[in-house]
């Protein structure tokens, strides 16, 4: 029953991180140095500035992860420089795929309300509500995520 007070933060999710995750997977398939991303990698944070791509949560390499993040961040700009505006790939990877995974209750990439910051993480909806992936993270990766959190708080 509608209470007139709007939606709770837990009822809203952004799906822009899906296309960034898909781009990271594409680069991982092209370059063997990034191959661990396909099984152990993660995408965190916003769709743009502050994005963090981790080559692996088990065998994190900060320099490699920063290189992969840069490739992912600039991929869209390179496509636009060619005269194209990418619509289909983001619609599929951020929209359709992530939405289907959400509706199935499967793990997917999405920005969710964590406290007072919207942060892109791997998550899923269960009968008990939103579940975000909880991992032990290497210190260097945790530090990057803390930097992104600070950046996002400054936007508010």
Language-model segments: residues:
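Long, compositionally biased stretches enriched for glycine and/or charged residues
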Residues: 26-156
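Glycine-/Pro-rich loop/turn segments that contact NAD(P) or position catalytic residues
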Residues: 1-35
